[in-house]
Regions:
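A conserved acidic beta->alpha catalytic loop
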Residues: 41-50
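Membrane-interface aromatic/basic loop that binds lipid-linked glycans or pyrophosphate carriers
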Residues: 275-362
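Donor-binding/catalytic cores of nucleotide-activated saccharide
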Residues: 72, 93-231
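Cell-envelope/extracellular polymer assembly enzymes that use nucleotide-activated donors
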Residues: 5-8, 36, 190
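Catalytic core of nucleotide-sugar-dependent glycosyltransferases
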Residues: 209-218, 223-254, 265-267, 271, ...
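Glycine-rich, basic loop-to-helix element that forms the pyrophosphate-binding segment
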Residues: 66-83, 104
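Short aromatic/hydrophobic "clamp" motif used to bind/position activated sugar donors
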Residues: 88
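Short, well-formed alpha-helical segments that are part of the catalytic scaffolds
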Residues: 15-29
Length: 362
């Protein structure tokens, strides 16, 4: 590919010393070389800044900036103000990127000036059944077609996260689009919704290895916020209102309202089986769970949600609902919750200790 575009890669960093060198190596080894790599350290207390500085000394494309604890949104906004490229790519310091990621994402826009954004599929170690776009075909779609696609899974990382997308810098600058520094999570989706409203054509990209590898970490970064029910409710309301505002452009607000009911019902079921939110007693959690499934439309609620994320679980739930096996459904949700919690901690432990050797002299 002819390297006529400068791509600004923005990497916010905070206490990421375990993973930072890996992601910097990934970016430096991209098959597309015309990059401006902007690393924003947000007051790390480990040696992340030293790792970044060392890479800056050996690769002239890397620029390192250090600020004190402004949060990820502020770090990204600083990167946007510094960026000089025609295209913007966001990457998190604790994930990985395939070597051909940027080249693959640039290919559609290199052949068409009318494409405002490229969204690619990703690979994840998440046990949550994330919607990753792997089943979508390579295609160029209109803004209305995209809105209808987003409507199916409005809370999915595929649409909300910034790291699987290629943005046009002029659209961001001309429309003064920035990350909201006043909220601790969901700011990615709000940023994207503003950007989506400026798009006429979007290219859906599907690559064999994805354009990004997303790792779930047991960092607790938003745990404190999400345990604050008042703040969680405030942010949920902001998210809902922004989505409503977006879908009103296409007269799809009623579809969103209905879908939102399905989603909230599923999350209430998920929360009531958790020990930390549903109560210590398993009997009490089961009773609450069973009471929620008494309405006649409960089957439609639960199966619609699961079908979008995990077809295998959907089949089990459908079978259990048809036979009125509430206890079986409870066990499915309980197991999913347990797996999600322990998988994250286990994967974090493995990654942290991957460098250790197992003794063989025993």
């Amino acid at each position: 590919m002819q390297e006529k575009y400068l791509v600004s890669v923005i990497i916010p960093v905070y206490n990421s010393s375990l993973y930072l060198q890996d992601i910097l190596d990934d970016v430096k080894k991209q098959t597309y070389k015309k990059l401006e790599i902007i690393v924003i350290d947000d007051g790390s207390s480990d040696n992340s800044l030293e790792i970044a500085r060392e890479n800056e000394r050996t690769d002239q494309r890397i620029q390192v900036y250090s600020f004190q604890n402004g949060g990820q949104s502020r770090a990204r906004n600083i990167g946007l103000r510094i960026a000089k490229g025609q295209f913007i790519r966001f990457i998190d310091a604790d994930d990985r990127v395939p070597a051909d990621s940027i080249e693959n994402m640039l290919s559609p826009v290199a052949n068409s000036d009318s494409i405002d954004m490229v969204i690619g599929n990703f690979i994840s170690n998440s046990p949550y059944g994330l919607y990753s776009g792997n089943e979508l075909e390579n295609t160029e779609i209109s803004d209305r077609q995209f809105a209808q696609l987003l409507l199916k899974t409005p809370r999915a990382f595929y649409f909300g996260a910034p790291w699987n997308k290629l943005y046009r810098a002029d659209i961001i600058r001309e429309n003064h689009i920035l990350f909201d520094e006043g909220i601790a999570w969901c700011e990615d989706l709000l940023f994207n919704l503003e950007y989506y409203q400026c798009c006429k054509k979007i290219h859906i990209l599907n690559c064999k290895n994805g354009v990004y590898q997303y790792f779930v970490r047991d960092t607790g970064a938003t745990g404190g916020i999400k345990n604050n029910k008042v703040e969680e409710a405030r942010i949920e309301e902001i998210r809902y209102q922004k989505l409503l505002e977006y879908f009103e452009q296409y007269d799809l607000q009623e579809e969103l309202k209905l879908g939102w009911k399905y989603i909230n019902f599923y999350y209430r079921l998920t929360n009531c089986v958790k020990r930390e939110t549903g109560g210590r007693s398993l009997r009490k959690r089961y009773k609450t769970f069973a009471e929620m499934l008494t309405p006649e439309d409960a089957y439609e609620y639960i199966c619609l949600r699961e079908n979008d994320y995990d077809p295998r679980v959907h089949k089990m739930l459908k079978k259990a609902m048809e036979k009125k096996q509430i206890h079986r459904m409870f066990l499915i949700f309980l197991f999913k919750s347990w797996m999600a919690s322990h998988f994250t901690k286990t994967m974090t432990f493995i990654r942290k200790h991957a460098h250790l050797r197992i003794p063989t002299d025993y």
